[in-house]
Structure formats: structure tokens, C-alpha cells
Amino acid sequence: MKATVIALFVAMLLVGCVRERITDYYDNGQKKYERTWKGQDLDGPVTWWYENGQKRQQINYKDGKKDGPFIVWNEKGKEIRRENYKNGEIVKD
């Protein structure tokens, strides 16, 4: 019984540590978005692209919370917005 409980606990820990990268594509083959999950939480960079292949926006997540710079570009690649986050909260410069 004790071994079964320990085995279940270890299995739950391992599942929670597995990282999975999800990528979706436009019909023309260009990337649409890419994000990384750790268990049920976003964890790592999340990037969106325009259909022309230009980056649209990027933000990093840590344990399901925004963490780091959030950057938005227009279709020509010009940065049009930037915010910084720490532990899910916007940080003033």
C-alpha cells in the first residue's frame, strides 16, 4: 500500500514537470503561435506571428504568470508596444 502511494506521488510529480511545446500554423505554412506548457500552466516564451511570418507579439510565462518583457510589433516589424511583467504583475519602469 505504501509503495503504491509513493509511486502515485512520484508519477504526479513527473507529469507536473513535463514541458510540452505547442505550435500552430497558418494555411500557408507560416507559424501562427508557439507556446510551452508545464503541466497545466504556461511556462516559457509565448510567441505569435503574422501570416507574413513577421513576429506579432512575445511574452514569457513562469508558472502560469507573465514574467518579463511583453512586446508587440506591427506587420512591418516595428515595435509598437512594450510592457514589463514580474510574477504576473505589470512593472513600471
Predicted features and spans:
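Sec-dependent signal peptide recognition
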Residues: 2-8
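Glycine/tyrosine- and acidic-biased, solvent-exposed loop/turn segments at the edges of beta-strands
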Residues: 3, 13-93
